[in-house]
A protein has these predicted regions:
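Long hydrophobic alpha-helices with heptad-repeat/coiled-coil character
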Residues: 1, 51-53, 146-148
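Sparse, context-dependent recognition of short Cys/His-centered cofactor- or disulfide-binding micro-motifs
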Residues: 5, 27-29, 54-55, 93, ...
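Core dinuclear metal-dependent hydrolase active-site scaffold
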Residues: 14-69
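Generic structural signal for residues in well-ordered beta-strands
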Residues: 11-12, 27, 149-150
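Active-site HxH/HxHxD metal-binding segment of metal-dependent hydrolases
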Residues: 1-20
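Cap/insert and terminal regions of metallo-dependent hydrolase folds
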Residues: 65-152
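Short, well-ordered coil/turn elements that cap or connect secondary structure elements
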Residues: 6-8, 22-24, 48, 117-118, ...
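Generic structural signal for short, flexible, solvent-exposed coil/loop and linker residues
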Residues: 9-11, 21, 31-33, 92, ...
Length: 152
């Protein structure tokens, strides 16, 4: 029994590149880049639909195809972050941590360009910074780039 009173039989340990069947779902964890221990993203599949989930990462080395739904962190934009450092809204040390732990708008665009989006139906932008992000701008730019609905 876990601290949340979940029986052991209902708990699953997810490990990088080790797909798990959970009911009708197939969960494939993959390594992401972050300053935390063992950061993971997830390809989640049920029947013929795939959801890709990536948050708390600044880079993903893998390429994906046949993605139907994408939930991805889009934490900040480089220009907003730099402006906040210049205006002393955030400290240079905090900027360094943001750069080493979070997906920027620019990196999200690079990630999208590197992957097959032909089956993509919608994108959900996650974990947008209150100070270093602009949800409406991010939504507009990603939607214009991909041609699919984007939600924040």
């Amino acid at each position: 029994m876990s601290a949340l009173n979940v029986p052991d039989s209902r708990q699953f340990i997810l490990k990088e590149k080790d797909a798990q069947n959970i009911g009708e779902w197939i969960i494939l964890p993959f390594q992401t880049e972050h300053d935390a221990k063992e950061p993971l993203g997830f390809m989640i599949q049920r029947h013929n639909e795939r959801l890709l989930f990536i948050t708390d990462s600044y880079f993903v080395r893998y390429k994906f195809k046949n993605i139907n739904y994408l939930m991805i962190e889009c934490n900040y934009s480089a220009d907003i972050l730099e402006e906040n450092v210049i205006n002393k809204v955030i400290h240079q040390v905090q900027k360094k941590r943001v750069l080493q732990s979070h997906f920027s708008l620019e990196n999200v665009k690079e990630f999208l360009n590197a992957n097959d989006l032909s089956q993509l139906r919608e994108i959900h932008l996650l974990h947008i910074s209150e100070r270093n992000g602009d949800p409406e701008r991010f939504k507009k730019e990603i939607q214009a780039m991909t041609g699919v609905p984007v939600y924040v």
